[in-house]
Amino acid sequence: MSQTSLKKERDPSILILDFGSQYSELIARRIRETNVFSLVVSNFISIEDINRINPKGIILSGGPNSVYEQNAPRCDEKIFNLGIPILGICYGMQLMVKELGGTVISATKKAEYGRAPLNIDQESDLLFDVEDKSIMWMSHGDSINCLPDGFNKIAHTENTLHAAISNDVKKLFGVQFHPEVVHSEFGMRVIKNFVYKISCCTADWTTETYIEETIPRIREQVGNKKVLLALSGGVDSSTLAFLLNKAIGNQLTCMFIDQGFMRKGEPEFLMNFFDKKFHIKVEYINARERFIAKLKGITDPEQKRKIIGEEFIRVFEEESNRLGPFQYLAQGTLYPDVIESAGTNIDPKTGERIAVKIKSHHNVGGLPKDLQFKLVEPLRKLFKDEVRKVGAALGLPDEIIKRHPFPGPGLAIRILGEVNNEKLDCLRDADWIVRDEIKKAGLYNDIWQAFAVLLPVKTVGVMGDKRTYSWPIVLRCVSSEDGMTADWSKIPFQILERIANRIVNEVISVNRVVYDITSKPPGTIEWE
């Protein structure tokens, strides 16, 4: 069945034009939290495409550029005459002002970063129920000097005269602060006001409606063909397995490829849970030695990811020929996966959008060019928290839904440098201790990820009056809402001490434990 014959996917009620902001996807998440579907699109989107999508509202994101720079990113200026409500955030507001005849100036002497009280100057639908002098998050070096005709100043801060503006006739609004970040006390109120009071959206983006819309789309796309799913036991592939099982039943075959990089006890748990408990067909493939052989001598993390991804598909192809034929490969690709694997940025010389790769994602970056399957990726527009809700609605238990995210390449990218069985055994034991103690302390559900990393160096230690020269283990525990940004977890010292003591006493070849306190950004959650 051709892709063009499929039923039309749901169009977003709110379009977010991305001008390079680190918060663009966060804006999308916040809008979805109001039960309204939103998507991030290029700032170069055409007027024709906007009219085809017919959104209820448009948001112009922030960005790192200055609007008066020669090649500053822009959008089609006709967008402001479509009659669609528009909210410009930070750079987005400045761009709107400039395009409509106002002026923006450098405000290096009064640049504003961090928390600032918002002083409301006049009533506005945008600031309805927002308390005067509430704290909002600022992050800008430029400011509006002169408003275009028809605009009013509706709020200011100590250093920003035009902290919020409006043109009620044309339904054009702007804020210099970032309502999408948690530091803005009434940020969600501002977003809800734009979504509901101004754009008149309907709260119809729910877990139930997603399932209702997705199941018939899967059936239409797949027809009577067979689907193969790589089942890892994580929340993404598990939710996808339940979703596909509900949609197409015995047309689905789940394949668990044990590449040797799983956490302690996971292969046994996975087979018992899906095959025996829920009677979803799972084929177990032991490919441990095959993967280890492929990684021999490989130290570069991108190479490891690519090799694992390609080998994964090769095994899939071989096993599908034996068990199949299968025409479709189902993947648990999520929205942040797509964003991270092919992010976007603006070329400062040409103003053109360019791809910026952060690191390849196992699902979307490691696929070989001669892939023999068609793809089924019904989760690719969802964030992680949305996937968990879908899983819960489909009947997945908490022990799966609340499991910490685990990368596709597994422990292979938590061992820095070359991977071998000795290092895997060492890391597997250390990682199990980390998670065991976190669970005993009742902190597991409060932490986004908690795991161990094995470094490719050795350190000197003393154990039993003898000198040791062994590997160090890094503890990595982070708090996050969606994995796009993260802060290191402030775990009580006594728990960290218990973890460290157990690792150095119970895990052979480890004599030192350190704790990573780097946030994302500037670091990433995984070390590779």
Swiss-Prot record:
Residues forming the Glutamine amidotransferase type-1 domain are: 13-204
Reactions performed catalytically? XMP + L-glutamine + ATP + H2O = GMP + L-glutamate + AMP + diphosphate + 2 H(+)
EC identifiers of the protein: 6.3.5.2
Its keywords, alphabetically, are: ATP-binding, Glutamine amidotransferase, GMP biosynthesis, Ligase, Nucleotide-binding, Purine biosynthesis
The pathway this protein participates in, as annotated, is: Purine metabolism; GMP biosynthesis; GMP from XMP (L-Gln route): step 1/1
The protein depicted here goes by the name GMP synthase [glutamine-hydrolyzing]
One annotated Gene Ontology cellular component of this protein = cytosol
Tell me the domain of life: Bacteria
Q: Which organism is it from?
A: Prochlorococcus marinus (strain AS9601)
Among SUPFAM superfamilies, the record links this protein to:
Adenine nucleotide alpha hydrolases-like, Class I glutamine amidotransferase-like, GMP synthetase C-terminal dimerisation domain
